[in-house]
Swiss-Prot record:
NCBIfam families: GroEL, PRK00013.1, PRK12849.1, PRK12850.1, PRK12851.1. GO terms for biological process: protein refolding. GO terms for cellular component: cytoplasm. This is Chaperonin GroEL 2. Forms a cylinder of 14 subunits composed of two heptameric rings stacked back-to-back. Interacts with the co-chaperonin GroES. It is found in: Cytoplasm. It catalyses: ATP + H2O + a folded polypeptide = ADP + phosphate + an unfolded polypeptide. PROSITE patterns: CHAPERONINS_CPN60. Together with its co-chaperonin GroES, plays an essential role in assisting protein folding. The GroEL-GroES system forms a nano-cage that allows encapsulation of the non-native substrate proteins and provides a physical environment optimized to promote and accelerate protein folding. Signal peptide: none annotated. It comes from Chromobacterium violaceum (strain ATCC 12472 / DSM 30191 / JCM 1249 / CCUG 213 / NBRC 12614 / NCIMB 9131 / NCTC 9757 / MK). HAMAP family: CH60. InterPro entries: Chaperonin_Cpn60_CS (IPR018370), Cpn60/GroEL (IPR001844), Cpn60/GroEL/TCP-1 (IPR002423), GroEL-like_apical_dom_sf (IPR027409), GROEL-like_equatorial_sf (IPR027413), TCP-1-like_intermed_sf (IPR027410). The keyword Chaperone applies.
């Protein structure tokens, strides 16, 4: 086991604070509408340029092990806030640094760190309650666009495109972000349910211009096994042929004789049919087939529930207004399922989302909800260079998370104003002793830090602005983008309540742990002896001449 270096008391804390300051100083230059960029070196390819706090934080590794521990703890604040709220990482870092710096003064003065932490925790609980009271619901498209713009560092185009996307696919819809091909941002909306499986044979194509197979008012056969024997399929095919409507077959696979017969029938014009593989794998495939059945008002023909392909009837088939099948995707538009059944299925999947343990499962379940409930919107990010594309894409993703958070818990006045207005709740807060009261004072001072940093980055005098904002009431604040004072909500400077709350909670949690630290242990770097010359066989023991 390697030898360890141990530091106690002030020498440990001073090292930790130094690490906190290095990381926070690098991150906080990005805060606010006039925040600056940070350039990150890459071992290959062009450097990355970012204004995203968590991206900067993740890059920082310090040589000094004790300083690095402090930096890593603040990094945890940024990444945790990013995970929960999707934005507010810089605000969280600034708050953590402020609480640590203020708190260390009291610790150095000999106060009990545990009571200070209890005071900080009480203050934060009180502030979080007040932020929830201040929050207003974020319902209109205009408010969603404003939240998106602020989060994307005052880029109104990004805010508007996100608001449009949410309007088209609903608040629950899936919105994905991809690299675009042009210089401008574009929005593509896929209506209906789309899944990533295409036609099994190009002979099914009936629209040569678009290279798709389009079926109007088709029946939809859902089968959970492979279809290779045409005899099993014949009864259904005959019933569909009599009805004169096209047929979409979704099965685990359609192969051999069955596929060949379907292709021949299509080419001869006897029956308009398209076969595709079922989406997903294993249990997820079964679930997705059931989703399609609910959406189209059909049943999954599965042997485990006593249904067989040869006995399938038209009543068991799903229906839709239109189906488009491309090489890689199938889209079912306007399924014939009943609204109440679809809503019940959505509710069922939402319960699974609450119980899901992994992010991957949660994401896949949310996609299924969106496909049933609304649709899927794709924002294609446009930029002139790859470096700009990466930076812009990260901002769009941040803005998307922020707007979702705003819809969830409402909005508060932005620019650090919400925290200053919530401080009124701390003035009459009851504490058990003077040291806990000092903990409350630490938070009172720290919640000014985000506004101070925004003003500093804008090139103005922080103390003057903070005093003027404190003199005002309600939503009165300072708009750093225009240099004006006024009603923050009217000026469109909004923050999601969830982002402000998460930033404060995570900052206080980690900063409280740092204040109560009295010992730090790190591995000592090993001094490796210089390697001797290798044994030069046959030269009579001249090996270790070094």
């Amino acid at each position: 086991m390697a030898a360890k270096d141990v530091k106690f008391g002030d020498s440990a804390r001073s090292k930790m604070v130094a690490g906190v300051n290095i990381l926070a100083d690098a991150v906080k230059v990005t805060l606010g509408p006039k925040g600056r960029n940070v350039v990150l070196d890459r071992s290959f390819g062009a450097p990355t340029i970012t204004k995203d706090g968590v991206s900067v934080a993740k890059e920082i590794e310090l040589k000094d092990k004790f300083e690095n521990m402090g930096a890593q703890m603040v990094k945890e604040v940024a990444s945790k806030t990013s995970d929960v709220a999707g934005d507010g990482t810089t605000t969280a870092t600034v708050l953590a640094q402020a609480i640590v710096q203020e708190g260390m003064k009291f610790v150095a003065a000999g106060m009990n760190p545990m009571d200070l932490k209890r005071g900080i925790d009480k203050a934060v609980v009180s502030l979080v309650g007040e932020i929830a009271k201040i929050a207003k619901p974020c319902a209109t498209s205009k408010e969603i666009a404003q939240v998106g713009s602020i989060s994307a560092n005052s880029d109104s185009d990004i805010g508007e495109i996100i608001a449009n996307a949410m309007e088209k696919v609903g608040k629950e819809g899936v919105i994905t972000v991809e690299d675009g091909k042009s210089l401008n941002n574009e929005l593509d909306v896929v209506e209906g349910m789309q899944f990533d499986r295409g036609y099994l044979s190009p002979y099914f194509i009936n629209n040569q211009d678009k290279q798709i197979a389009a079926l109007d008012n088709p029946f939809i056969l859902l089968f959970d096994k492979k279809i290779s024997n045409i005899r099993d399929l014949l009864p259904v095919l005959e019933q569909v042929a009599k009805s004169g409507r096209p047929l979409l077959i979704i099965a685990e696979d359609v192969e051999g004789e069955a596929l060949a017969t379907l292709v021949v029938n299509t080419i001869r014009g006897i029956l308009k049919v398209v076969a595709v593989k079922a989406p997903g794998f294993g249990d997820r495939r079964k679930a997705m087939l059931t989703d399609i059945a609910v959406l189209t008002g059909g049943e999954v023909i599965a042997e485990e529930v006593g249904l067989t392909l040869e006995k399938a009837t038209l009543d068991q088939l799903g229906q839709a207004k239109r189906v488009e099948v491309g090489k890689e995707n199938t889209t079912i538009i306007d399924g014939a399922g009943e609204a109440a059944t679809i809503q019940a299925r959505v509710g069922e999947i939402r319960k699974q989302i609450e119980e899901a343990t992994s992010d991957y499962d949660r994401e896949k379940l949310q996609e299924r909800v969106a496909k049933l409930a609304g649709g899927v919107a794709v924002i294609k990010v446009g930029a002139a260079t790859e470096v700009e594309m990466k930076e812009k894409k990260a901002r769009v993703e941040d803005a998307l998370h922020a707007t979702r958070a705003a819809v969830e818990e409402g909005v508060v006045p932005g620019g650090g104003v919400a925290l200053l207005r919530a401080r009124a709740t701390l003035e009459n807060l009851k504490t058990d002793n003077a040291e806990q009261e000092a903990g409350v004072k630490i938070v009172l001072r720290a919640i000014e830090a985000p506004l101070r940093q925004i003003v500093k980055n804008a090139g103005d005098e922080p103390s003057v602005v903070v005093n003027k904002v404190l003199e005002g009431k309600g939503n009165f604040g300072y708009n750093a983008a225009s240099g004006e004072y006024g009603d923050m909500l009217e000026m469109g400077v909004l923050d999601p309540a969830k982002v402000t709350r998460s930033a404060l909670q995570h900052a206080a949690s980690v900063a409280g742990l740092m204040l109560t630290t009295d010992c730090m242990i790190a591995e000592l770097p090993e001094d490796k002896p210089a390697a001797g010359m290798p044994d030069m066989g046959g030269m009579g023991g001249m090996g270790g001449m070094m």
